[in-house]
């Protein structure tokens, strides 16, 4: 029996614990929707800035659509340690579920976080020297355009590092292609977040890719048990710790936006709870910002049935009530400082802790 076939049987075993909404797969690649999103990139708005911001978010909205590729999902099923993930999740759900109010799928993602961080993906400050194998003596020297071969795997640029031992230059392409990420299994925030979010979706879970204007990305998954979106960050093995960035890292943020197969949502208030943690939101006026996100969401949901649209509208309204409920004066749990990345790198990004 292939791993992919085993995955389907194992998922079916727990199907009764998933809602029909969760089990309903999106089309492998919804070409009509992707065409609408791309057309929206070229539409004019109130001004040039509005158009550029709209194009940026329409481009980002294509990322979760790429998670629906059936061939890539089959590749993921061959990689994921499904028996182990489900066994641990089932055991924890039986032992801790009632007390902690988490469901099987929540424990599944908790275990996926642990496996992804500890056993699967590797963080790269500088890549090891390919000639002498040195790790500690390799330093970044420049960034340059990716080669045609690197561009085949959607490299967004290539870093060049140099070994001080042997002077060898090592290329570190910043790949975005999911098949390549499953091959290289390494990177920084972008590679980690995209590959982890894809694995969540490959397991059949509703997943968001979370973009932050201050150069960090992570993910959220929808908890069917709690009926809410839950923060996940594979770089930190973090579960349901949305204030980790503002409290633990000392990171100030302006925009935090979630992209899923169901729409686009401004989730800044989940992650920024206090005025002194909020950077100015100056991309476009807030009303225009809402218009951009609503337009993209409308395009994504265009072909859904009236009942599906109504269900998502109810979810949107419930999430809006949740986000509006956060009290800036309420005590916040202490959070860990950033674990991933070198000290110099995190400090340069303003993520070295609240005393940075």
Curated annotation (Swiss-Prot):
Q: Which cofactor does it need?
A: Zn(2+)
Q: Which protein family is it in? A: Belongs to the transglutaminase-like superfamily. PNGase family.
What name does this protein carry?
Peptide-N(4)-(N-acetyl-beta-glucosaminyl)asparagine amidase
Q: Please name the InterPro entries in this protein's record.
A: Papain-like_cys_pep_sf, PNGase, Transglutaminase-like
Could you tell me which SUPFAM superfamilies the record lists for this protein?
A: Cysteine proteinases
What GO cellular component term, any one, is given? cytoplasm
Note the SS bond partners: none
Enumerate composition-biased segments (Basic and acidic residues). 307-316, 346-356
Q: Which UniProt keywords apply?
A: Cytoplasm, Hydrolase, Metal-binding, Zinc
Tell me the active site.
Answer: 189, 216, 233
Report a single Gene Ontology molecular function: metal ion binding
Q: How is the cofactor bound?
A: Binds 1 zinc ion per subunit.
Q: Where in the cell is it found?
A: Cytoplasm
- EC number(s) reported in the record: 3.5.1.52
Instruction: Indicate the principal place this protein occupies in or around the cell.
Output: cytoplasm
Q: What lineage does UniProt assign to this protein's organism?
A: Eukaryota, Fungi, Dikarya, Ascomycota, Saccharomycotina
Please give the organism.
Yarrowia lipolytica (strain CLIB 122 / E 150) (Yeast)
Q: Where is this region: Disordered?
A: 300-356
The EC class name is hydrolase
So where does Zn(2+) get bound?
A: 129, 132, 163, 166
Q: Which residues bind substrate?
A: 236
Catalytic activity line of the entry = Hydrolysis of an N(4)-(acetyl-beta-D-glucosaminyl)asparagine residue in which the glucosamine residue may be further glycosylated, to yield a (substituted) N-acetyl-beta-D-glucosaminylamine and a peptide containing an aspartate residue
- Per the record, the domain of life is Eukaryota
Query: Any idea what job this protein has?
Result: Specifically deglycosylates the denatured form of N-linked glycoproteins in the cytoplasm and assists their proteasome-mediated degradation. Cleaves the beta-aspartyl-glucosamine (GlcNAc) of the glycan and the amide side chain of Asn, converting Asn to Asp. Prefers proteins containing high-mannose over those bearing complex type oligosaccharides. Can recognize misfolded proteins in the endoplasmic reticulum that are exported to the cytosol to be destroyed and deglycosylate them, while it has no activity toward native proteins.
């Amino acid at each position: 029996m292939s791993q992919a076939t085993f995955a389907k049987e194992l998922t079916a075993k727990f199907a009764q614990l998933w809602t029909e909404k969760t089990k309903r797969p999106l089309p492998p690649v919804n070409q009509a929707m992707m065409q609408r999103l791309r057309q929206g990139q070229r539409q004019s708005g109130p001004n040039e800035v509005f158009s550029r911001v709209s194009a940026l978010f329409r481009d980002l909205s294509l990322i979760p659509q790429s998670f629906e590729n059936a061939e890539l999902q089959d590749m993921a099923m061959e990689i994921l340690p499904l028996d182990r993930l489900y066994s641990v999740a089932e055991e924890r759900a039986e032992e801790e579920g009632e007390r902690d109010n988490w469901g099987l799928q929540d424990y599944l993602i908790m275990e996926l976080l642990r496996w992804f961080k500890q056993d699967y993906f590797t963080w790269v400050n500088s890549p090891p020297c390919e000639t002498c194998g040195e790790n500690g003596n390799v330093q970044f020297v420049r960034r340059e355009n990716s080669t045609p071969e690197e561009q085949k795997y959607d490299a967004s640029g290539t870093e060049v590092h140099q070994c001080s031992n042997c002077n060898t230059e090592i290329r570190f392409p910043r790949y975005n292609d999911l098949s390549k990420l499953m091959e290289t299994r390494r990177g920084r925030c972008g590679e980690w977040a995209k590959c982890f979010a894809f694995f969540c979706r490959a397991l059949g879970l509703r997943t968001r890719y979370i973009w932050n204007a201050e150069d960090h990305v992570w993910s959220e998954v929808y908890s069917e048990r709690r009926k809410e979106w839950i923060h996940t960050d594979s770089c930190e093995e973090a579960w349901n710790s949305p204030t980790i960035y503002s409290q633990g890292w000392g990171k100030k943020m302006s925009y935090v936006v979630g992209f899923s197969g169901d729409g686009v949502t401004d989730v800044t208030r989940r992650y920024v709870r206090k005025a002194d943690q909020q950077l100015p939101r100056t991309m476009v006026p807030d009303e225009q910002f809402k218009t951009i996100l609503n337009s993209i969401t409308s395009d994504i949901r265009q072909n859904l049935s009236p009942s599906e649209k109504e269900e998502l509208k109810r979810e949107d309204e419930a999430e809006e009530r949740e986000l509006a409920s956060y009290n800036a004066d309420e005590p916040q749990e202490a959070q860990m400082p950033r674990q991933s990345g070198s000290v110099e790198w995190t400090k340069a990004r303003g993520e070295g802790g609240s005393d940075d």
